[in-house]
C-alpha cells in the first residue's frame, strides 16, 4: 500500500515547480561528464592519461577547438574517469596553469612550486637555470624508480599564450621531461588556435608528441534539438510522476513547434556554443511559476528577442526629440551624399530646413543647445569622428560618421514613446 502511495505521489504545483527549478538549474549550470558527440576524443584522452597515471609513461597532447566547444569539460570528464578506476594506487598530482595568469615563466614556476606544495623544499635554494629548478621540483616527488614515482599532470589552459614567453623555456622543459624517462608526466594543452603548432619553436616542436585532439562543434541541427530536449526533460526519478510526464510531453511538443525550431535554428546558425543554448534555456526556465507551470513557445521567442536586442537601437529609445531629429538629419545627409562624412554645420542646416518646412517654432532651439545635443550623441557613441583628422579643426566643422543604419532608426522610431508625427513623417521621407 505504501509503495502504491509513493508511486502515485501527487505534490502541490508550487513544490513541483521548485523541484523543476532545482534540477534544471543544476543541470544547466554544472557541467558534468563529457560534451555531446565526442566519444572517440574522450576515449583517446582517457587512454593517454591512463598510460601516465597507471603505467608511468610520460605523454603530451593538445586539445584544440573554438571557445565553448567543451575542451575543459572533456578533460574534466576524462580525469574523473581516470581517478575512479580501481587500478589507481595513489592520487596523481595535478598542476593547472593559465596563460592569462602566468604571463612569464618565472611566475609559472612559482605557481608550479605552490601547487606541488614544495615551497619548504625549495626554500632559499638558488638554481643556475629554469631547467635545473623544474628538474629539482620533480626530483623531490620521486619515491624510487619510475613506476613508483608520483605522476604529475600539467594542464596548460590558453596554451598559445605560453608560446609567446621568452624562448618558450617552460614549454621546452615540460616537453623535454615528458620525452625523457624521468618522473611520469603528462602535459595537456588547451587552446582555441588551430595554428598553434606554427607558434612553437623548432626545438620545442621536436620534443612535442604531436598528439592533437580536435573539438569542432560538428553536431548537426537535429542533434542540437536532441541536446535541447534532453537538457529540459525531467528524470524518471522525479517525485511526482504525473507532473514529470506532462512536463516532458510539453517539452516534446516544444521541440516539434515550428516557432521554437525557427528560434533554435537562428541560435544554431549564430553560434553552436552549447553554453549560449544553456543560457537561452535557463532564461525560459526562470519564467516558469505556479500560474505559468510550463514553458511555452512564446517564452522562447521573448527570451531570444531579449538576448539578441540591438544595444544601439535601445539607446535611441532614451534620446531626446532634438537628438532624434539630429540623427534623422544625419541619415538624410548620408543618403544624399552616398555615405560621405558630415559635420555639425551640415546637420544643423538640414535640421533648420525641417523647421522652416513645418513653419512653427516647437523645435526651434538655440545653436548652443543643438551643439550640446550633438556632443551627447558623440558621448553615446552613436556618431564618431573620422580618423586621421586634425584635432585643431573647430568642432562645428569636424567630420563625423553615423554608426546607425536605416533599420535601427526605423525600429527606434516605432518604439520611441510619444514620437511626434511630423518627426516620424520627416524620418520616413528621408529613409524611403
UniProtKB/Swiss-Prot annotation:
Pfam family, one: ORC4_C
Main location: nucleus
Ranges that cross the membrane: none
Highest taxon, organism lineage: Eukaryota
InterPro entries: AAA_16, ORC4, ORC4_C, P-loop_NTPase
Single GO BP term: DNA replication initiation
Cellular compartments per GO CC: nuclear origin of replication recognition complex
Cross-referenced Gene3D superfamilies: P-loop containing nucleotide triphosphate hydrolases (3.40.50.300)
Residues where ATP binds: 65-72
Subcellular location: Nucleus
GO function term, MF aspect, one: ATP binding
The keyword Nucleotide-binding is assigned to this record: yes
Annotated keywords: ATP-binding, DNA replication, DNA-binding, Nucleotide-binding, Nucleus
Self-association and partners: ORC is composed of six subunits.
Similarity comment text for this entry: Belongs to the ORC4 family.
Role according to the record: Component of the origin recognition complex (ORC) that binds origins of replication. DNA-binding is ATP-dependent, however specific DNA sequences that define origins of replication have not been identified so far. ORC is required to assemble the pre-replication complex necessary to initiate DNA replication.
Protein name (Swiss-Prot/TrEMBL): Origin recognition complex subunit 4
Protein species of origin: Xenopus laevis (African clawed frog)
Lineage, top ranks: Eukaryota, Metazoa, Chordata, Craniata, Vertebrata
Amino acid at each position: 500500500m505504501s509503495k502504491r502511495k509513493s508511486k502515485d505521489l501527487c505534490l502541490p504545483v508550487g513544490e513541483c515547480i521548485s523541484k523543476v527549478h532545482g534540477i534544471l538549474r543544476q543541470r544547466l549550470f554544472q557541467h558534468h561528464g563529457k560534451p555531446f558527440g565526442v566519444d572517440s576524443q574522450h576515449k583517446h584522452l582517457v587512454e593517454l592519461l591512463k598510460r601516465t597515471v597507471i603505467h608511468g609513461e610520460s605523454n603530451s597532447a593538445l586539445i584544440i577547438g573554438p571557445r565553448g566547444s567543451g575542451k575543459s569539460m572533456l578533460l574534466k570528464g576524462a580525469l574523473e574517469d581516470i581517478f575512479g578506476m580501481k587500478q589507481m594506487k595513489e592520487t596523481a598530482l595535478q598542476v593547472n596553469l593559465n596563460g592569462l595568469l602566468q604571463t612569464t615563466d618565472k611566475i609559472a614556476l612559482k605557481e608550479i612550486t605552490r601547487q606541488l606544495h614544495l615551497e619548504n623544499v625549495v626554500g632559499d635554494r638558488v638554481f643556475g637555470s629554469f631547467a635545473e629548478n623544474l628538474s629539482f621540483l620533480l626530483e623531490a616527488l620521486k619515491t624510487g624508480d619510475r613506476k613508483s614515482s608520483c605522476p604529475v599532470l600539467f594542464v596548460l589552459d590558453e596554451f598559445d599564450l605560453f608560446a609567446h614567453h621568452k624562448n618558450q623555456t617552460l614549454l621546452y622543459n615540460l616537453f623535454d621531461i615528458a620525452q625523457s624517462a624521468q618522473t611520469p608526466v603528462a602535459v595537456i594543452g588547451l587552446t582555441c588556435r588551430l595554428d598553434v603548432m606554427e607558434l612553437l619553436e623548432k626545438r620545442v616542436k621536436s620534443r612535442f608528441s604531436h598528439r592533437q585532439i580536435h573539438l569542432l562543434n560538428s553536431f548537426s541541427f537535429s542533434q542540437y534539438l536532441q541536446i535541447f530536449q534532453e537538457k529540459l526533460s525531467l528524470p524518471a526519478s522525479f517525485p511526482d510522476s504525473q507532473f514529470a510526464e506532462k512536463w516532458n510531453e510539453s517539452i516534446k511538443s516544444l521541440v516539434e513547434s515550428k516557432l521554437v525550431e525557427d528560434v533554435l535554428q537562428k541560435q544554431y546558425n549564430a553560434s553552436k556554443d552549447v553554453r549560449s543554448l544553456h543560457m537561452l534555456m535557463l532564461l525560459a526556465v526562470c519564467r516558469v511559476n505556479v500560474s505559468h507551470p510550463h514553458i511555452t513557445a512564446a517564452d522562447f521567442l521573448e527570451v531570444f528577442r531579449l538576448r539578441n536586442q540591438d544595444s544601439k537601437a535601445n539607446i535611441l529609445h532614451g534620446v531626446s526629440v532634438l537628438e532624434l531629429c539630429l540623427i534623422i538629419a544625419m541619415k538624410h545627409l548620408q543618403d544624399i551624399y552616398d555615405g560621405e562624412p558630415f559635420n555639425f554645420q551640415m546637420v544643423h542646416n538640414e535640421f533648420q530646413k525641417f523647421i522652416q518646412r513645418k513653419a512653427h517654432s516647437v523645435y526651434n532651439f538655440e545653436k548652443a543647445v543643438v551643439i550640446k545635443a550633438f556632443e551627447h550623441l558623440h558621448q553615446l557613441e552613436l556618431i564618431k569622428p573620422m580618423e586621421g583628422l586634425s584635432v585643431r579643426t573647430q568642432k562645428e566643422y569636424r567630420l563625423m560618421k553615423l554608426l546607425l543604419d536605416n533599420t535601427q532608426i526605423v525600429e527606434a522610431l516605432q518604439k520611441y514613446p510619444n514620437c511626434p508625427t511630423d518627426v516620424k513623417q520627416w524620418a520616413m521621407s528621408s529613409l524611403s
